Amino acid sequence: MISLKPLYDEIICLACFLTLFCGCDVYQPTKCRSYVGGYVQMNAIDIWQEKGMPSYLIVHLKEEPPVKTYHMCSTGKDAEIYTRLCTKHEDMTYNKVRSIGPAIEDSTPFFVDCDFTSIEVFADKDFNEEHPAGSNLGDIVRFMSWSPIKYIKSGYSELHIYNPEELSSAFYPIMREYFMENYFQRGALSTCYPIDKLICDTDSDDLVLLGHDAPGFLGALYFEMSPDDEKEFVITVTFNTDDGKSLSATTMMKF
């Protein structure tokens, strides 16, 4: 039996070439083998507290130039890395047509190039009696994010149906600050499923393809308890990756 894969790959590369070099306004209907159109190399995280928001931190990809990407139009070694990541996520049979523009990252979902095994959160001072300085706060900090991995592993057939009763009371007020309101309408369909768990209840299956089709936002860390006495802490957050890295960031947090 003759394999059509080389021909298929050539067609994809030709479509990408036309998209990238035929003009800034050109959008080409392109059959995408995978749901995830590209990955961004991740080497560091950034965390911060939004002004006037005392109870949570944002976790974000820290983009340190040059930003390295692997995507559906990559060639050579980068194309091999992209295919390996798609294979890892069982994302090889999407085969739907998208309109791909000059900036590929704006036309198709992108995610970071690693998944995570665990999250750790520490404070530099006693948080309360049960959480002295340096202890893990995973049992009082909730991780909130999105991921399309359930949609992908369903064979691209099972969309998430938004139901606010299935989520914590903190999910909507926080996440609506970063995502369009229509994501939060009752019954709204989405390829991305919400993640809404105490850190101590998460495992590696919950920490795959984090974000909502874009590689920057990784999630929010909501503190379900306020500290007993101190109101200002140095908080350190560590994301442990499935390729053996520990990515840490520190910020001052005021409650």
Question: How does the language model describe each region?
Answer:
Residues 25-255:
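Non-catalytic macromolecular-recognition regions in eukaryotic signaling proteins
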Residues 2-12:
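Bacterial N-terminal signal peptides that target proteins for export
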Residues 20-23:
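C-terminal motif of bacterial Sec signal peptides marking the signal peptidase cleavage site
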Residues 16-17:
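Intrinsically disordered, compositionally biased low-complexity segments in eukaryotic proteins
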